Amino acid sequence: MIPILFFYIPGWCSSHNFYVTLVSKKYFMSLDFHPLSLADRSLVWKYTENAGRRNCDLSFANLYAWRMLYRTEVAEWGGFLVFRFYADGHLAYLMPVGEGDWCAILQALKEDACRLSHPLLLLGVCEDFMPQVEECMGEDCRVNANRDHADYIYLRESLAALSGKKLQAKRNHVNRFKALYPDYRYEELTDEWVPACLDLTRRWVESRQDEAEKRAVAAESEAIQRALAHREELDLRGGVLLVGEQIAAFTYGAPICRDTFDVCVEKADVEFEGAYTVINKEFVSRLPEQYKYVNREEDLGVEGLRKAKLSYQPEMLLMKYSVWSSCTVKAEIEECGLTPEQHLIKWQTRALW
C-alpha cells in the first residue's frame, strides 16, 4: 500500500533506450487485458510458481479477493504476465512476472498507460528488478520506497517452533494461553466454520471507532467474504482456534510461489489472551515442508503491528518500490492524448495491496 505524491519536474524525459530501443512497430502488439477471474488461477500459477518472487502482491488469493475494489485485469505479453488495476482513479501495473525482453514489456506498459491518458506507474518492484527497470527507463525513472509496505518474510521452521532466546516471550504467550484455556483446540478451516469466521470479522469491523478506519476495514471484510466464499477454488489453507465452541481466532493463506506461503488474513478475539500467537504457531506448524518461507505481509506503518511483526524475528524485510515514468516531452504528451491537467497529477495514489 504505497502512497505516492506525483509532481511535475521539467526535463524528466530523456532520449534513453527506453524510448528508442523499441521503435520498430513489430514490438508494439497491444496488451489484451481481461478482468481477473477464478479461471485465471492456473495461468497465474504458471508464471509465479518458479519465479522466485515472494511479495504478497502475487498471491492469487489476494489478487482475486481484492479484484472488485481495484478492477484488476490480467494479460500475457511476450513471455510475461501483467496485472493492471486502478486506485483513486489512477492506473497502475504490478511489476511483470516472467522472462523475456524487459525493455520491450516496459515500453508496452508505457504505451498502454499513455493510451489510457495516464503516466506509467509500476508497483511491487522488488530490489532485484530495479537494475532492469532503471536500465530500460533511464532518467525517466522516478523511484519511491516506503518502509510501511515492506513484506515481513519468516522461516517457516522458526515460526512453527518458536525456539531460541529471542522468541522466549512468544513461547510464554503460548503456555499462558494453554493454562488459561485448557479446553482449546485447533481445527482446519472448513465450510462449517466460515459463518463463525465472518461473525468474528463483523465484530472486528464494528469495534473500530474512527470512520475512515471503519471504511478501510470494511473493504478488507468484503475481501475476506469473497475469499472464504471461494475457499476451494483459491486453494486456501486455513485454521480456526476454538475455546469450547467459541471461535477465538482464524487465519488463512495461499501459496505465492513454490517455496513461499502467504498468510493473507489472521483475526483474533482479543478477549482471549495470546490467541494471535497461538493461531500463528498452530497454523504454520501444519504447513507443508515445501514452504521454506512464510510471508506475513506489511505493517502499513501501524506502530503496534510493526512491533508485533518485528518481535517474530523476520528472516528478511522485502522492500517494494514504486516507479513512475511520465510523458513529459510535448510530442509524447500529444501522442498519448494527455491534457495538462492529466499530466500534472498532484494527488496521492492510495494503497493498492
What are these regions (language model features)?
Residues 235-326:
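Aromatic (often tryptophan-rich) hydrophobic motifs at membrane interfaces
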Residues 142-161, 295-353:
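Active-site/acyl-donor-binding loops of N-acyltransferases
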Residues 8, 16-17, 27:
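Intrinsic-disorder-associated, low-complexity terminal segments enriched in Asp/Asn/His/Tyr and depleted
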Residues 138-215:
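Acyltransferase donor/substrate-recognition loop-hinge adjacent to the catalytic core
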Residues 1-10:
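Hydrophobic alpha-helical signal peptides and transmembrane signal-/tail-anchor segments
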Residues 20-83, 336-337, 344, 353:
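Non-cleavable N-terminal signal-anchor transmembrane helices
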Residues 57-129, 133, 242-270:
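Conserved donor-binding loop and adjoining core beta-sheet/short helix segment
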Residues 41, 45-71, 184-269:
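A conserved beta-strand-loop-helix scaffold within acyl/acetyltransferase catalytic domains
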